[in-house]
A protein has these predicted regions:
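Membrane transport/envelope proteins' first extracytoplasmic loop
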Residues: 1-178, 193, 425, 546-629
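Hydrophobic, regular-secondary-structure patches
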Residues: 1-35, 61, 76, 136-144, ...
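Short beta-strand boundary microenvironments
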Residues: 34-77, 449-459, 463-523, 537-539
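Alpha-helical transmembrane segments, especially those used as permease/efflux helices
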Residues: 139, 164-167, 221, 265-287, ...
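Hydrophobic alpha-helical transmembrane segments of multi-pass inner-membrane transport and secretion
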Residues: 163-200, 221-235, 275-282, 351, ...
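Small-residue-rich transmembrane alpha-helices
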Residues: 185-189, 221-254, 267-293, 321-334, ...
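Amphipathic cytosolic juxtamembrane alpha-helices at the membrane-cytosol interface
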Residues: 203, 207-223, 306, 393, ...
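Short cytosolic juxtamembrane segments of multi-pass membrane proteins
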Residues: 292-308, 738-752
Length: 752
């Protein structure tokens, strides 16, 4: 905004104090981006007293051309002292003192006049911070041409910006927790099975069923509570690592956020304990109920009753079918709120996990045929063991299937999003050079005019992107040259086509998909924006695909923007040169030199695309971490199932060896059981993971961010899931195989 409007502010009766601000960023030589505020130290004292306290070097701060103050934390991190120089992309800045900064954001202060010269903003300010004695009257007087936002509104805007991001992060965490519960369930079940003989001894000595259940359940709950408490502590330390990843993602996408070490709370311990106890109870109560119903002699002999398992598998499948029906209903309800979409994804995983028992029954003949071809009789026995011990194998397969499905679903979603982003860049960001960077430096308008008249250049697109208020929320307005974009780009159109640039040249606008979905606006509708001279009405010509902002973008001709907002600022320039121009390289070099002489950053098309993809990849670092954690959890689930089967069937193994099976053959049976469960888990994850990817892409992301991600099927996620299932199955079988080699048949069958 123009500096001369400060005179009007001084005479406004509602204004108690005001402070003009230059708000920009600079790149330090160390690679860190730091916010620089240009302020008037006398006017700013009333608005930001916390920054004015103990501010040394005031005279040097005012008189030094490139004198700055750094916040205490930033100076400490960089090892800077008064008199040192900061190397930045705007030249050397001399540190004349430090100040306490209550914010977590690294901050540099500079006198506003010096900041205006540093950024080429003579006669302009970025914003004015105010303290008012009356709000409504002030807003009515300054509504035209200015964006007025209270501190509370700004906090609400920032919270709204993070709402979808936070919601998605919480949902992914719950999915990982869902897989972890399977592990606790498996572990509790193993704890019961491994004590089967102890239960038989207690029953034979006169203990009744209630006493046995109480004794065993107390032990399981204690172990679950201990494990949950340790998990809570481990989760807290893991959060200290993940905080850096999340803060980096927020800084890249929304606003700078310095990572702060999470505070310890005893609620973490309590929550972990409750989750551990709950999962342990569910994992232990069913095998305990089975255990106390078994005759004490059978318990002493270690034999497992397998009656009714097929019926239970069919009943579980029917329950799973009902839950899948609920999942579809929740999917339909996701148009009301994205929470229903997340609930649908959970129901999908729960419902399909209940099909594992029936799947193992149906695939039993196939596994027997495959294993028989591989190793003969031991293979057939291994396939039969998987099918006959559904109470153990089905849970392990369900846990592993859910983990692999999450891996396939998340990988497919990330890969599809990345491919959609690449497609979007190839259609919309096609300039040969990009000059300037939002938040760092404005492109002088005379430089734009100079390049515009430069011979040999096909076109110059002056881009301005500014946040404005619309329907009591925030959107972005972008000013462009539609003639240049119509000639050199091929926007992805949701509704409309390249011919819709014509109405934009005549004062119309095009809107992004996120704006179209967020505000239910159709081509032909009219929208009203608050311009410099009052409300201005625009006709929507078309809707284009866009991934730059989930809050919505309204794009208009620069001439329309100037007429509406009176803002001549240019954030960046896109330079286009015809592909057949023989002097293409020389022209690009000349433009680059001119821009660099003005201190403007220059990027080639490939560099810009690479920077965007780098930000994208860092954004999903947390998602990838969670995917790895779920695989690790499921690995232990398979290992627990194999160990449980081994403990239950030690006598059976002894009989096999007494009948002539060699130790390697018995070990091979254990290995094949692990591979069989891994194979079934993988086969199920193909369908479930693809369905989960569809829900994430077409429902959750669309509802959360209001943009379309195109599904790009890739073999990578499925090959990764296949490799994971093989490696995890092999790794999970190592300990049971080791136990086979360490156990003698005469010890296993001594009671027969």
């Amino acid at each position: 905004m123009e500096e001369n409007m400060l005179a009007r502010l001084m005479t406004d009766p509602a204004v108690e104090f005001f402070s003009p601000v230059i708000d920009r960023t600079v790149h330090l030589a160390q690679g860190e981006t730091v916010r620089l505020l240009g302020v008037d130290p006398f006017l700013d004292r009333a608005v930001r007293p916390q920054l004015a306290r103990n501010r040394p070097g005031a005279l040097s701060f005012l008189l030094g051309e490139k004198a700055v103050l750094a916040d205490v934390q930033l100076a400490k991190e960089m090892g800077l002292h008064s008199g040192d120089f900061l190397e930045t992309n705007r030249g050397k800045l001399r540190l004349v003192g430090t100040f306490p900064n209550p914010s977590s954001e690294p901050l540099i202060l500079m006198d506003i006049a010096h900041a205006q010269r540093l950024f080429g903003l003579q006669g302009k300010v970025d914003r004015v911070d105010l303290i008012l004695n009356e709000d409504s009257g002030f807003r009515s007087r300054w509504a035209n041409g200015f964006r007025i936002q209270s501190g509370q509104q700004r906090r609400a805007t920032l919270s709204d910006m993070l709402r979808a991001f936070r919601l998605n992060l919480q949902a992914l965490s719950l999915l990982a927790l869902f897989v972890g519960i399977f592990l606790v369930y498996n572990t509790a079940m193993f704890a019961v099975v491994s004590r089967r003989k102890d239960a038989g001894i207690l029953r034979s000595l006169g203990a009744n069923r209630r006493e046995v259940i109480f004794a065993f359940l107390s032990e399981i709950l204690f172990l679950g509570a201990l494990g949950g408490a340790l998990g809570g502590i481990a989760g807290y330390f893991l959060s200290r690592f993940l905080t850096n990843l999340v803060a980096g993602t927020i800084s890249n996408l929304y606003f700078f956020l310095r990572p702060v070490i999470p505070e310890w709370s005893w609620w973490i311990l309590l929550l972990g304990t409750l989750l551990g106890c709950g999962a342990s109870f569910l994992g232990g109560i069913f095998p305990l109920a089975e255990l106390v119903r078994v005759d004490p002699i059978q318990a002493l002999q270690g034999r497992t009753a397998v009656r009714g398992q097929r019926k239970m598998a069919r009943n579980a499948a029917l329950a799973g079918l009902a839950i899948l029906g609920i999942s579809l209903a929740l999917l339909e309800a996701s148009s009301i709120h994205v929470y229903f979409g997340f609930a649908s994804a959970f129901a999908l995983l729960i419902g399909t996990s209940l099909f594992t028992g029936l799947t193992l029954i149906k695939l039993g003949p196939f596994l027997r045929w495959v294993f028989n071809r591989i190793s003969g009789l031991p293979g057939k026995v291994a396939a039969g063991n998987i099918r006959q011990n559904l109470g153990r194998t089905a849970v392990a397969v369900a846990a592993f299937m859910v983990a692999l499905s999450m891996s396939v679903g998340l990988s497919s979603m990330i890969g599809s999003f990345r491919q959609s982003l690449v497609w979007w860049m190839s259609t919309q960001l096609q300039a040969d050079l990009y000059i300037g960077k939002i938040g760092e430096a404005e492109v002088p308008e005379n430089f734009y005019e100079e390049l515009k008249s430069m011979k040999g250049l096909g076109g110059v697109d002056p881009f301005r992107n500014v946040q404005v208020s619309y329907r009591e929320t925030s959107i972005y307005v972008s000013a462009v040259d539609p003639a240049v974009l119509q000639k050199y780009t091929n926007f992805g159109w949701l509704k409309g086509g390249n011919e819709n640039w014509e109405p934009v040249k005549k004062g119309g606008v095009i809107v992004s998909e996120s704006f179209y979905r967020r505000f239910k606006v159709q081509p032909g509708d009219r929208i009203v924006l608050n311009g410099a001279q009052g409300p201005a009405e625009f006709k929507v010509a078309a809707v284009f695909y866009d991934y730059s902002s989930e809050h919505g973008v309204v794009m208009m001709d620069r001439s329309t923007y100037l007429k509406t907002f009176g803002d001549h600022t240019i954030n960046s320039l896109g330079i286009f040169i015809d592909a057949g121009n023989p002097h293409r390289k020389e022209l690009l070099d000349e433009v680059r030199k001119k821009a660099q002489s003005l201190g403007l950053p220059v990027f080639t098309r490939d560099q810009l695309h690479g920077n965007i993809l780098s930000v994208f990849d860092s954004t999903f670092a947390v998602t990838r971490s969670m995917r790895v954690l779920t695989i690790v959890v499921a690995f232990f689930g398979i290992a627990g199932a194999l160990l449980t089967l081994f403990m239950e069937r030690q006598k059976e193994f002894g009989i096999y060896r007494a009948l002539g099976f060699s130790t390697p053959q018995v070990a091979g049976m254990t290995l094949m059981e692990g591979l069989g469960m891994g194979l079934v888990s993988f086969l199920l994850s193909i369908g479930v993971g693809t369905a989960l990817a569809w829900v994430l892409i077409r429902v959750i992301n669309l509802r959360s961010f209001n943009w379309t991600i195109f599904f790009y099927p890739e073999m990578g996620p499925y090959l990764l899931a296949a490799a994971t299932s093989i490696l995890a199955s092999l790794g999970a079988a190592v300990y049971p195989i080791w136990k086979v080699y360490r156990t003698y048949p005469q010890m296993q069958i001594r009671e027969e």
